[in-house]
């Protein structure tokens, strides 16, 4: 079957929340808050992408991910670029992206040691609907009060530079070595290309599209290319099987997707540029 629903994994985090996104059961009072929801591929497979939801009540650690070359030199299959779609954000919520001004890795390391790295970064306000593509090497941190869908290259490789005194391992030497201590520049996002199809991100390690239409359409992925379908709101059918918000599906080959009216779908695939999808 070319469409496959992925397993949902709820991950408890002290910085998480109990009020989640529609499609997910809220956290239980008295239980640990939920910080992440992952969609796991079949055991033994090396999926190129990973989709998560994040729910934050505190600032997360300041961190960085290596690119492909540095990751492979360290024994990993790939580096990590990420994209975020902000679903909800409190009025004062921010995300740190890059440094306020060009600096040196030595200065960044000193800031990580004494905590001044917090003020070295550019904290930008975010709101629902914002899309950010954070390439490997970008020093970043997700702030409090944010609900976000994160699409990333699938590798468990994060270098924490600063964690507000929390007792977790830091990776200062490795992280500084792969950091680009420069201001963040938003990559071009093409946007609406017609037919209910918008390109949110392309030109990096993967393409992220947003779809909204009513009725059935057939898509055909090139051989060897897998897509990830994320129903943000609404639902519908994929190859006759029902899907709904709170799920994630992988798609290979030719598939018929029939969303309900006003449904909001994301579709990601690991390719540097958009490909013809619709038959």
For the regions a protein language model found, what residue spans apply to each?
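Transition-metal
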Residues: 1-103, 164-185, 208, 268, ...
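A short hydrophobic beta-strand segment most commonly corresponding to one strand
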Residues: 82-85, 141-164, 262-279
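C-terminal amphipathic alpha-helical segment
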Residues: 159-226
């Amino acid at each position: 079957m070319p469409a496959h629903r992925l397993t949902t994994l709820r991950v408890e985090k002290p910085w998480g929340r109990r009020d989640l996104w529609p499609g997910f059961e809220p956290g239980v009072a008295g239980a640990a808050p939920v910080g992440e929801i992952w969609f796991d591929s079949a055991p033994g497979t090396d999926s190129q992408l990973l989709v998560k939801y994040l729910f934050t009540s505190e600032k997360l650690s300041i961190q960085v991910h290596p690119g492909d070359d540095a990751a492979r030199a360290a024994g990993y299959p790939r580096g990590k670029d990420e994209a975020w779609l902000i679903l909800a954000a409190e009025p004062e919520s921010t995300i740190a992206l890059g440094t306020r001004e060009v600096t040196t890795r030595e200065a960044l390391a000193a800031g990580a040691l004494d905590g001044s790295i917090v003020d070295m970064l550019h904290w930008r306000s975010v709101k629902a609907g914002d899309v950010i593509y954070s390439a490997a090497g970008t020093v970043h941190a997700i702030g409090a009060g944010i609900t976000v869908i994160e699409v990333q290259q699938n590798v468990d490789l994060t270098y924490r530079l600063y964690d507000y005194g929390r007792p977790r391992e830091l990776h200062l030497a490795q992280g500084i070595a792969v950091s680009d201590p420069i201001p963040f520049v938003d990559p071009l996002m093409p946007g609406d290309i017609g037919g209910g199809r918008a390109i949110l991100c392309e030109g990096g390690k993967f393409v992220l599209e947003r779809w909204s239409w009513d009725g059935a359409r057939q898509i055909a992925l090139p051989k060897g290319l897998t897509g990830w379908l994320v129903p943000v709101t609404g639902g519908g059918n994929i190859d006759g099987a029902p899907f709904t918000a709170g799920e994630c599906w992988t798609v290979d080959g030719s598939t018929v997707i029939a969303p309900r009216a006003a449904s909001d779908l994301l579709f990601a695939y690991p390719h540097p540029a958009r490909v013809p999808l619709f038959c």
